[in-house]
Amino acid sequence: VGFKAGVKEYKLTYHTPEYETKDTDILAAFRVTPQPGVPPEEAGAAVAAESSTGTWTTVWTDGLTSLDRYKGRCYHIEPVPGEESQFIAYVAYPLDLFEEGSVTNMFTSIVGXVFGFKALRALRLEDLRIPPAYVKTFQGPPHGIQVERDKLNKYGRPLLGCTIKPKLGLSAKNYGRAVYECLRGGLDFTKDDENVNSQPFMRWRDRFLFCAEAIYKAQAETGEIKGHYLNATAGTCEEMIKRAVFARELGVPIVMHDYLTGGFTANTSLAHYCRDNGLLLHIHRAMHAVIDRQKNHGMHFRVLAKALRMSGGDHVHSGTVVGKLEGEREITLGFVDLLRDDFIEKDRSRGIFFTQDWVSLPGVLPVASGGIHVWHXPALTEIFGDDSVLQFGGGTLGHXWGNAPGAVANRVALEACVQARNEGXDLAREGNEIIREASKWSPELAAACEIWKEIKFEFEAMDTL
C-alpha cells in the first residue's frame, strides 16, 4: 500500500483514553491552554506527540520503528474548575524514551520543543511521576538527611543558617570575619550568596581560605561542628570541580551550587563528586521563578524539586510561607514532603497529582530563606518541623548590636520554640508569647524582637490551586 503521506490529526494516534498506565511509565500532568478552536483531545494529543515521537507530518521512517512501543500517550483529560479555556492533560511516556540517570535528557524531551508549539497558547507542567525503575538509575542526593545529621552531630531541631550580606562587594578577609561572627554566635551554617562566584573584589580561592579559617576557629570555640556553603558554581564544569576539590582539601564539610543556572549536567557531576569525597551539597534555586512563577506557563517548582532530588543535593531552597518570597502553605508543604519523604500519596489539595515512590533515594533538607526573622521562628518550626534549615540573612546581620548577637538571638529563639513544642505547647497559638518569654533572659533576643516587631511581607500568594 505504501505509506499515507500528509498531515493527520494528532488525536488519531496520540489520544488513547483506554490506555492503562504501566508501573514503568513516566507520567506527566500538563495544564494546557489551547488556541481558540483547538479541541482538548487534539491539544492534549499534540502535547503527547511533540514531547515524544511525533512531528507535524507523517514521515516514511515511522514505518521503520514501532510507534506503539515508543509514543507518548494522552490518556486522560480533566477540566480545570473555574477556567473555561484550560484543562489538565495526563500523558504517559514509555521508559525507553529516556536516558538512564539523566535529568537533562528527561527535561529535553518532556519540556523541550513542545512549549513553543503554536496550537497552544500556554503550557505548564504541573507534576511528574518518576517510576521506581527510573529513580533507581540516579544516585540522588550525595548524603541525605540522616547521614547529614550524623556528620554534623545535630539532632532533634531544625538547622540554622545565614546568608552573608552585603552579597557583593566585601573583601575575602571581611567576608571571613562575618562568617566567623555568625558561627561563633550559634548558627550551624553560613552561606555564600548565590551571586558570589569569583569576582574582581573577591576571588574564590581567597574566600575559601578565609571561610575555612572562620569555620575552624568557631568550631574550636563552640565545640560544635560548623559549616559554610562555599559556592562552587563556575563558568565551566571543570572550574566548578576544581573549586569543589579545593574545598575538600581544606577539609570543610559542605559546598554549594546554583543548580538551575549551572545546569543539571553540571549539578549531577558535582553531586557525584560530593558523594565520592564526603562533601555535603547545598543547592540554591536561582532562576526558578523565571520557570515556575506564571500560573499557566512553565513548570511548577514541585517538578524542579523532584528533578533536584534525582540530580542530587542535600539542601534545596524551597520558600518560607511566611517571609518575603512566594509560597502557599499547603502547596509548599506538598513539595517539601516530596523532597524529604520516601513515599508521598497523591493529594490534589496540596497540588500533588501522582503518588510518588522514591524507593529509598536519600531525602533533601528544605531550606527556608528570605525575609525571615526571630518572630517567624515559631511558625517556621511549626510548618517545617525538625528536618529543615532556617536561614536568617538580614535577620542575623541586621541586628543592632552586630552579627554575633544576631546569631545568638536566632539560636535562642529556635531553641525556645523547639523546647516549647516538645513540652506540648501550641506554636501557632502561643508563638509570640514563647519568644517574649525567652527574650526576658536573652538581651540579644530582646533587641532583635524590638527591631523586627512590625515587619510583615503581606501579599496574596500567586501559587494557589
Swiss-Prot record:
The basic functional RuBisCO is composed of a large chain homodimer in a 'head-to-tail' conformation. In form I RuBisCO this homodimer is arranged in a barrel-like tetramer with the small subunits forming a tetrameric 'cap' on each end of the 'barrel'. Coiled coil: none annotated. Substrate binds at X113, T163, K167, R285, H317, S369. Belongs to the RuBisCO large chain family. Type I subfamily. HAMAP family: RuBisCO_L_type1. One of its GO terms (biological process) is photorespiration. RuBisCO catalyzes two reactions: the carboxylation of D-ribulose 1,5-bisphosphate, the primary event in carbon dioxide fixation, as well as the oxidative fragmentation of the pentose substrate in the photorespiration process. Both reactions occur simultaneously and in competition at the same active site. The record marks K324 as: Transition state stabilizer. Gene3D superfamilies: Ribulose bisphosphate carboxylase, large subunit, C-terminal domain, RuBisCO large subunit, N-terminal domain. Binds 1 Mg(2+) ion per subunit. NCBIfam families: PRK04208.1 (NF003252). This is Ribulose bisphosphate carboxylase large chain. Its EC number is 4.1.1.39. One of its GO terms (molecular function) is magnesium ion binding. Its cofactor is Mg(2+). The active site is at K165, H284. Heterohexadecamer of 8 large chains and 8 small chains; disulfide-linked. The disulfide link is formed within the large subunit homodimers. Mg(2+) binds at K191, D193, E194. It catalyses: 2 (2R)-3-phosphoglycerate + 2 H(+) = D-ribulose 1,5-bisphosphate + CO2 + H2O; D-ribulose 1,5-bisphosphate + O2 = 2-phosphoglycolate + (2R)-3-phosphoglycerate + 2 H(+). The disulfide bond which can form in the large chain dimeric partners within the hexadecamer appears to be associated with oxidative stress and protein turnover. The modification N6,N6,N6-trimethyllysine is found at K4.
